[in-house]
Amino acid sequence: MPISSQGTSIDDFLASNKNLFTADFQFPIMILRDSAIEHNIQLMASYCKSLGFELAPHVKTPMAPKIAKRQIDAGAWGLTIANFSQASIMFESGFTRLIIGNEVMEPTSIAEIAKINGSGAGDIIFYIDSLAGLEIAQNSIKKVPNAKLNVLLEIGAEDGRAGIRDLELLKIVLAEIEKDERIYVRGVSGFEGAVPGGGRYGDEVEKIRVFLRQIVAAAKITKPYVRDDKIIISAGGSSYFDYVAEEFAKYDGEAT
């Protein structure tokens, strides 16, 4: 933004129609072509709709509420972000259905999420992948009136960065969550983009598919613990979304 425009609103700045090359902009500058953004938004929305899948675009990189609004207007189910600080920004910008695509370990963040969900003002979901993580969540909301946490059980790959590797452990964590009426299991998730050795060539493809099948298997175990009519089955990146669609389509039941 030009120095002379600092302190103005976004709408006022855009209305001023500053010239990128003659105004007092500070470089370097990244610019986005509006037509390209709109093309990408509509293309992904159309792709997901054609398959019967919902999209919760990850907005951690742009963190631009105006772009996120366009994605929601195009049919996105909600938004994904990386942590609670990002969730706070998007929530304060008017977006109420948010998935934090990570475990949340900070007690103050967990307590705030529980307050928002409990008040009915928002639907903020985050990951749990262990009994230790569950215990942190439970301890964080002890003093929160009407606390409500919405969680996805994260499934992980062997030698991966996070997530439950063992479906027997998944059953144990689910059984513990069921004892706590403040915590709502919404479904399962996993990030296929970080599967060790995964890719688009030869045996790399099967490694991705095996992991996605593990998520589907986990969903079948998790479904009886979900209080909603539909379970959420989610996977992550932008590299293998076609494999995700093919493998998740094999889930036999109602899902989001």
Where are these regions (language model features)?
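Eukaryotic N-terminal low-complexity, Ser/Thr- and Lys/Arg-rich leader segments
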Residues: 1-16
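Conserved active-site and cofactor/substrate-binding residues in soluble primary-metabolism enzymes
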Residues: 32-35, 39, 62, 85, ...
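Active-site loop/helix belt of alpha/beta enzymes
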Residues: 157-256
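Glycine/Thr-rich beta-alpha phosphate-binding loop at enzyme active sites
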Residues: 25-26, 36, 199
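Surface-exposed amphipathic alpha-helices with a cationic face
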Residues: 41-49, 68-72, 138-145, 178, ...
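Active-site-proximal beta-alpha core segment in soluble small-molecule metabolic enzymes
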Residues: 58-198
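N-terminal glycine-rich anion-binding loops that anchor highly charged ligand groups
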Residues: 13-17, 36-63
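Generic N-terminal amphipathic, Lys/Arg-enriched alpha-helix
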Residues: 12-32
